[in-house]
């Protein structure tokens, strides 16, 4: 199914769209890890299909911009108990905990570390688009603090590749 077709045809609000897509993933599962923005005139949600029957959605504040250059970017500290601003699948923490791969930071369940992965060499170009987006919104990253530029030493690197940006 198409997320947009389902949401637009069945939901009156962004929150209803989140709840609808979440219920479909609860029931049927998902074979990909998609990240989509669901918005209406009153609120905007960042929805992430994580794995199998697991998903999470965070209500975005009015004063932020979300950059998603073809990468899922789960770097948020989320309060899973804040049902006003965070909706998620029932087993988002219990399933990975029961199966031994739940990750915790400072004693708190870490959605990003549990379901995400570091951006490897294959994702470096998406990361550079993320940095360009930050610059567009006048929130540039600082070289040496947020990233470093390194020479691309791969044998199959094209001459145009030059340097790659690596997240620190």
How would you name each of these model-derived features?
Residues 1-68, 164:
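Structured, non-membrane catalytic/scaffold regions adjacent to prosthetic-group chemistry
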Residues 18, 22, 29, 41-44, ...:
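C-terminus-biased signal that marks the final domain/tail of proteins
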Residues 66-76:
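Short, surface-exposed polybasic-aromatic patches that bind anionic ligands, especially phosphate groups
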């Amino acid at each position: 199914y198409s997320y947009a077709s389902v949401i637009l045809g069945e939901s009156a609000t962004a929150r209803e769209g989140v709840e609808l897509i979440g219920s479909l993933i609860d029931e049927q599962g998902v074979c990909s890890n998609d990240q989509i923005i669901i918005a209406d005139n009153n609120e905007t949600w960042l929805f992430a299909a994580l794995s199998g029957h697991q998903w999470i959605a965070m209500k975005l504040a009015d004063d932020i911009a979300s950059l998603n250059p073809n990468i899922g970017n789960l770097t948020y500290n989320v309060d899973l108990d804040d049902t006003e601003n965070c909706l998620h699948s029932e087993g988002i923490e219990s399933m990975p905990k029961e199966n031994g791969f739940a990750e915790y930071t400072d004693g708190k369940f870490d959605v990003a570390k549990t379901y995400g992965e570091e951006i490897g060499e294959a994702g470096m170009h998406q990361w550079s688009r993320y940095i360009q987006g930050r610059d567009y919104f006048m929130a540039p990253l600082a070289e040496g603090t947020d990233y470093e530029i390194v020479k691309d030493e791969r044998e199959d690197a094209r001459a145009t590749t030059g340097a790659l940006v690596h997240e620190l």
